[in-house]
């Protein structure tokens, strides 16, 4: 599994499993609504009165109608839904490699 998919897949799978109604906003501003029927690396199959195949590269935002629990296999044992950052950790300033001497 690609590193970038480690949050996306569990989130979409929880939406599919729990049949959570979602609003999907496309990059052109169009809002689609329905339930995630299926998904793969490139598309989401969204079901409402009809099924629509929505290409992920066209999606801006996926908004569930209610909170979902989407825990991936996180080796740190963290139980929060925000993987990849620790909000309680002190922030270190980032330094570009061009600035480092």
Swiss-Prot record:
Residues 9-68 form the Sm domain. Keywords: RNA-binding, Stress response. InterPro entries: Hfq (IPR005001), LSM_dom_sf (IPR010920), Sm (IPR047575). Residues 70-86 have a biased composition (Polar residues). The keyword RNA-binding applies. GO terms for molecular function: RNA binding. Residues 63-101 are annotated as: Disordered. GO terms for biological process: regulation of DNA-templated transcription; regulation of RNA stability; regulation of translation, ncRNA-mediated. The keyword GTP-binding does not apply. Gene3D superfamilies: 2.30.30.100. GO terms for cellular component: cytosol. Belongs to the Hfq family. Homohexamer. RNA chaperone that binds small regulatory RNA (sRNAs) and mRNAs to facilitate mRNA translational regulation in response to envelope stress, environmental stress and changes in metabolite concentrations. Also binds with high specificity to tRNAs. Positively regulates the expression of the yst gene for heat-stable enterotoxin (Y-ST). This is RNA-binding protein Hfq. It comes from Yersinia enterocolitica. The lineage of its organism: Bacteria, Pseudomonadati, Pseudomonadota, Gammaproteobacteria, Enterobacterales.
């Amino acid at each position: 599994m690609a590193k970038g998919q480690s949050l996306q897949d569990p989130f979409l799978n929880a939406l599919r499993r729990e049949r959570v109604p979602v609003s999907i906003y496309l990059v052109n501003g169009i809002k689609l609504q329905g339930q995630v029927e299926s998904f793969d690396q490139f598309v989401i199959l969204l079901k409402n009165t009809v099924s629509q195949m929505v290409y992920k590269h066209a999606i801006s935002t996926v908004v569930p109608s209610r909170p979902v629990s989407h825990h991936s296999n996180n080796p740190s044992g963290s139980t929060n839904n925000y993987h990849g950052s620790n909000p309680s950790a002190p922030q270190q300033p980032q330094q570009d490699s061009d600035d480092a001497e």
